[in-house]
Amino acid sequence: MAPNIRKSHPLLKMINNSLIDLPTPSNISAWWNFGSLLAMCLATQILTGLLLAMHYTADTTLAFSSVAHTCRNVQYGWLIRNLHANGASFFFICIFLHIGRGLYYGSYLYKETWNTGVVLLLTLMATAFVGYVLPWGQMSFWGATVITNLFSAIPYIGQTLVEWAWGGFSVDNPTLTRFFALHFLLPFMIAGITITHLMFLHESGSNNPLGISSNSDKIPFHPYYSLKDILGLTLMLTPLLTLALFSPNLLGDPENFTPANPLVTPPHIKPEWYFLFAYAILRSIPNKLGGVLALAASVLILLLIPFLHKSKQRTMTFRPLSQTLFWLLVANLLVLTWVGSQPVEHPFIIIGQMASFSYFTILLILFPMTSTLENKMLNH
């Protein structure tokens, strides 16, 4: 029999084992589509970002004008920018749904895969943050000032750390230059960590909605899931293109159409929608260091999830009580997102504090308690 180059060539063999002949559970649902969608998001963002970087100038006097120039004078520059800006939103939608899937179906029990995923989330958040500063509008400047200033809450080294990050005594030209360098570098780091993430996943194989071993019923990734992923891609591209072409500024802040001015503070400083849940948790604590710790905990709590798993069943498919709690957590995050966009006044302050408290309570206390209760119910 003639050798198959797809299975014998050192490079093609790796691609074949990851994307073509990969044994995959036969019953994974559409919730398993988001991994490939995230890969497509990353590819799109790197491509559009590269094209934008060719026309961008990382200088405080020219940054705002260079972005305007890209949109006005570069062939399809407006489209590239709109796809890049709104592509970030879709990246976060996909990663939130991907994490939600992992929580619901107990995928976090693959600890290495889960931990590399958390690292990916943190890197993505860092990339989005430094990227938002680059157009050098009002919200870019003040967002950068407020968020970087939080590091000054770190005892003893805080102030030195902030001035080191800024490259001066305030957010200025050196800050913009280094943020551009970081925004260029981080997506390639994300791509590298993604390969690690995939490598760990392929050590164990995919989880499935039943949470039981699927070794007895595997199907090849291609053509079944390759086709399913292409369908998922078209279903994601449709709303992305609709948003980028019909209302590209829907998710942006109007304040960012004004060039950065250190002498005028915007009435409401708030980040992009995908950071609002964490921003609400930060604001709900009246102490600076406490707020920073809560902000960090709101994301790093994901690292604790595998250790808080007390159920005898892996997934929530047959656990109605945990399901109820899960959807309560989703609703809670939506409330946090909404509160984060509101001004700091009554009743939003107390709503934010209650939502922040319940966020940590659900994850740290109620989930393990409910799992233990469900285990007991199984015995009767």
From Swiss-Prot:
Instruction: Classify the protein's membrane topology as the record does.
Output: Multi-pass membrane protein
Q: Which parts of the chain are coiled coil?
A: none
Where is heme b b566 bound in this sequence? H98, H197
Assigned keywords, A-Z: Electron transport, Heme, Iron, Membrane, Metal-binding, Mitochondrion, Mitochondrion inner membrane, Respiratory chain, Transmembrane, Transmembrane helix, Transport, Ubiquinone
- Cofactors (names): heme b
Q: Where are the transmembrane segments?
A: 34-54, 78-99, 114-134, 179-199, 227-247, 289-309, 321-341, 348-368
Gene Ontology cellular component terms for the protein in this record: mitochondrial inner membrane; respiratory chain complex III
* Binding site residues for a ubiquinone: H202
- Entry-linked SUPFAM superfamilies: a domain/subunit of cytochrome bc1 complex (Ubiquinol-cytochrome c reductase), Transmembrane di-heme cytochromes
Q: How is the cofactor bound?
A: Binds 2 heme b groups non-covalently.
Q: GO molecular function terms here?
A: metal ion binding; ubiquinol-cytochrome-c reductase activity
Q: How does it assemble?
A: The cytochrome bc1 complex contains 11 subunits: 3 respiratory subunits (MT-CYB, CYC1 and UQCRFS1), 2 core proteins (UQCRC1 and UQCRC2) and 6 low-molecular weight proteins (UQCRH/QCR6, UQCRB/QCR7, UQCRQ/QCR8, UQCR10/QCR9, UQCR11/QCR10 and a cleavage product of UQCRFS1). This cytochrome bc1 complex then forms a dimer.
Protein family according to the UniProt entry: Belongs to the cytochrome b family.
Query: What does the UniProt function comment say about this protein?
Result: Component of the ubiquinol-cytochrome c reductase complex (complex III or cytochrome b-c1 complex) that is part of the mitochondrial respiratory chain. The b-c1 complex mediates electron transfer from ubiquinol to cytochrome c. Contributes to the generation of a proton gradient across the mitochondrial membrane that is then used for ATP synthesis.
The UniProt record's further free-text remark is: Heme 1 (or BL or b562) is low-potential and absorbs at about 562 nm, and heme 2 (or BH or b566) is high-potential and absorbs at about 566 nm.
Q: What is this protein called?
A: Cytochrome b
Q: Which organism is it from?
A: Tragopan satyra
Which gene produces this protein? MT-CYB
